[in-house]
Amino acid sequence: TLGAKIYNVGTSPNGLNINKNCGSTFPKKIKSLVKKHKVDLGISLDGDADRIILCDEKGKIIDGDQIIAMLANRWKRKKILKGGVIGTLMSNYGLQNYFREQKTKFLRANVGDRYVKESMQKNRFNLGGEQSGHIILGKFATTGDGLLVALEVLFSMRKGKKASDLLNVFKPMPQILENILVRDKNIINELRCKKAIRKANKLMGRNGRLLVRKSGTEPKIRIMGESHNKNLIIKCIKIIKQSIKY
């Protein structure tokens, strides 16, 4: 229907290679292929296709936050958007600022698509998602669906808009995410870690924000720092890392 020429990659499963060097968690693969084939858009899904990351024609990776911003604009124009948009604690602060400017209500849920869904239902919103690419289009489904999101983007591109123009909606605040492998995720509840987190937050002050949390899927502690001062983010994350890696 859309008349696109498609290059398929990572579509030969053998039961062991799910998400191996491909998909939404390995975006540099799609980036290299977009440049190689000089295509208009790269679409990268995870193994069960509930998560999506895109790559524009210039080779720039487009995360879930930018996709959500684009979808909110599209649905708002079409008078489809209900209530506002649900993001998470990981959503870039630039997205929040953008929605404030657009007078679009934006609320944050805990990290995880189940919490996004719960908040959407509670607030009667029909759009929500995560920076990682879990995006729920409440008009069509009650769970993340990367294929539906891809179709929404492709339909928007039918009018001749380039992906780079369509999907770079807002200027994100510099953000650094570090994942630390640990034996016990409860380490962040220990006194030395709590002290380090307090120290880092004091150093960050009003110049940005820090988020330290246990991974819900891996034996890792995730530390996210966000600020216009990149060196400050690095310093704050280092303080917390040193208390975890000993």
What is the meaning of each model-derived region?
Residues 1-160, 166, 172, 178:
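Phosphate-binding chemistry for phosphorylated carbohydrates and sugar-nucleotides
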Residues 160-246:
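Catalytic-core signal marking the mid-to-C-terminal active-site face
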